[in-house]
Each structure stands twice: as C-alpha cells, then as structure tokens.
Regions:
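Polytopic alpha-helical membrane proteins, predominantly small-molecule transporters/carriers
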Residues: 1-341
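Short, intrinsically disordered C-terminal tails of secreted or membrane-associated proteins
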Residues: 343-349
Length: 350
C-alpha cells in the first residue's frame, strides 16, 4: 500500500488536509445559491465520501511494498478493530451534519472556527492521551491559542448583520455541538489502525488505514439514513425534492465529499510518521482556510456599516496569528523528529 516514509511528505499531506478540509464546504455554498437545502447536499456528500474511499482502497491501498493489501487485510481483520472504525464514521457524521447546519445558519467564517476549533481542541487532547507523543506543554499551549481564535470568531459574529445569517444563534449552537461530538471520532478511528503501519508489519486483527477508512465511510453513509432523515423532517424537506435535483446539483455535493475524503485519507497516512496528535492538529488549520473563504470570497462580513473593515480585518489577523502561533508551538514538539521514518539497515550494516 502507499504510505508516507518521511517527515516532509507527511507535512505536505497535512497541508493537503488543511486545504481540503477548509474548502469542501464551498460546495454547500454553491448549492445554496440554487436554493438547494443542505439536507439534500449532504446525501450527495456522503456518496462522494464512500466512492472516494473505495477508489483509494483498491488503488493506493492495494499496491506497494509496505503494509498489507486491502483485500488481504479484510480477510485477517477482527470485529474488535473493525467496529471502532465503523463507530467513528457514525460519530463524525452526526457532528458534520451539525456543522453543516451551522454553516447554513451562520456562515463559513463563523461556523468553522467554532465547530472545527472546538473539535481540534478535544480531538488533539484525546489523541495525545491515547498516543502520548510530543511535549504536552507546547501542544496544549497551542490549543489555548486556538481557543482564543474561536472566541474572536464569536465576537466578530456579534457584529454581523442579521441579514447575513438566517438564524445566527442556531448556527452557533449547532457549531458548538458539532465540535463537542467531532472531537471523539479521530481517536476512535485510530484505535482500529495498526500502529506504525508505514514502517512495521500490520498487527494481527488490526486494519490498514485504507481498510479502516472504508468502514469509516460505511458508518457515515448508513448513519445518514437516520441522522439526515431526521434533519429532513425537521426542515420540511422531502426525498422527492432530492430526486428532482439536477445533475449539476448532485455533482456539486459528490465533489464536496470527494474533496473532504481525499484530505482525510492523506491525514491518516501522515499520522504514522507525524503521530496522530500532530497530524490531526496540523490538518485542522482548515479553520483558517474556511474563514478566508467566507470573508474574502463569499463576503460574509461585507456590510461595512455593521462590521467596519478595520474591525473585520483585525479579527481575521488575530485569528490567523493565533492559529499560526499554535501551529508553531505544536511543530516544535520533538515527536516530529523522533517519528521520522528511517530505512531499515541493510544486512551488512549494524
């Protein structure tokens, strides 16, 4: 299977994660311009996640000298390791639907910093407890700065005109709930994956990252039948509306799922080199990317009378500074140096 063998490659994968996770929600914004409800977008999103995972599993996950091919791994895995991957997909799906509700109500520039920022704090903390790599003082100092960025986003939202959000309080509450739930999915998924899969044999019963992502995607897809159906009923949306959608609208949602899953796959692959804590934290720089999309492309704070330009720019700069400082603090962790993949010595070397 395809794996990352060096720190520079792992860091590049985390950058891809950051860009993908921060950009996929643009597909929801594009669909919303056509008055396509988020509940319907999310069906196509789940399809995109599943299709991308299957494609990666039988291409990147089945070729290469490292680890174990996907089909062979499926024959040796046990339920005790498969179930955590499936459950992590269910947990993530609930949290992500709540985040989509937050984006739909409060905008990307607000929902992402609150929801994903809170998820980052919890997910990084739980990942560190599960796999303690790095200096906790530096890591948690970085997380404290991320909390500052979340607070600044909430403060900026109070200056947002009411016309910019359909239900701002609902959006903030949904984003907070999304962050609280989403913080648990990443450590849950890592429980199912064989440790050090890029440089060590796959442990009996455990899953390769590609197979784990298949069950994660299945958890997302099938839990959607419950979670999204409930959101459809509360929102007055019917399945008939979904099937009346155009090919373009469905394609946009599928594209969003593919973008998100590509980013997540690269993050999991990088985790063997950088460690789950660092990999997850670096990838969640997506919050800044999403805020930039919301502010600079979708102009979510465009009313200068309610949100003076200097104020919005100051908040954005402060958010960027907090995120950059947190990244620097986390990057200084020696775990990044200790977990670099080293080629095994040849037979003639000691």
């Amino acid at each position: 299977m395809f794996v990352a063998h060096s720190l520079p490659i792992a860091i590049c994968f985390c950058v891809v994660t950051m860009l993908g996770w921060g950009s996929w929600a643009n597909t929801q914004k594009l669909s919303g311009k056509a008055h396509w409800p988020f509940q319907l977008v999310y069906w196509d999103y789940a399809v995109g996640v599943l299709l991308c995972t299957i494609l990666f599993t039988f291409t990147l996950g089945s070729h290469g000298p490292a680890g174990m091919a996907a089909l062979a791994n499926m024959q040796t895995m046990t339920a005790s390791f498969m179930l955590p991957a499936l459950i992590s997909g269910v947990i993530f799906n609930l949290s992500n639907i709540l985040l989509v509700v937050g984006i739909d109500s409060a905008g990307m520039a607000v929902a992402f910093p609150i929801g994903v920022g809170l998820s980052l704090v919890l997910g990084t903390a739980f990942s560190y407890i599960q796999t303690p790599k790095g200096q906790p003082g530096l890591i948690f100092s970085g997380l404290a700065l991320i909390i500052v960025a979340m607070i600044l986003s909430s403060v900026a939202h109070r200056r947002l005109p009411k016309a910019e959000a359909t239900n701002p309080r609902k959006g903030i509450i949904a984003s907070i709930l999304a962050g609280l739930v989403q913080g648990f999915f990443y450590p849950q998924l890592m429980r199912s994956i064989s440790p050090d899969f890029s440089s060590s044999p796959i442990l009996p019963g455990t899953l390769t990252p590609y197979v784990a992502l298949v069950f994660f995607a299945l958890g997302v897809f099938f839990s959607n039948l419950l979670f999204n159906t409930l959101f459809m009923r509360t929102g007055g949306v019917t399945y008939a509306e979904y099937f009346r959608g155009t090919l373009r609208l469905h394609s946009i949602g599928v594209l969003g799922g593919i973008i998100w899953m590509i980013a997540f796959s690269f993050n999991i692959i990088a985790s063997s080199v950088a460690g789950p804590t660092i990999s997850y934290a670096l990838g969640q720089g997506a919050t800044l990317i999403a805020a930039l999309w919301g502010l600079l492309v979708w102009h979510e704070f465009r009313d200068d009378r309610a949100v003076p330009g200097n104020w919005s720019r100051s908040c954005l700069w402060a958010m960027r500074s907090a995120w950059a400082a947190s990244r620097r603090l986390q990057d200084r962790s020696p775990a990044l140096e200790l977990t670099v993949y080293l080629e095994p010595p040849s037979k003639g070397e000691k």
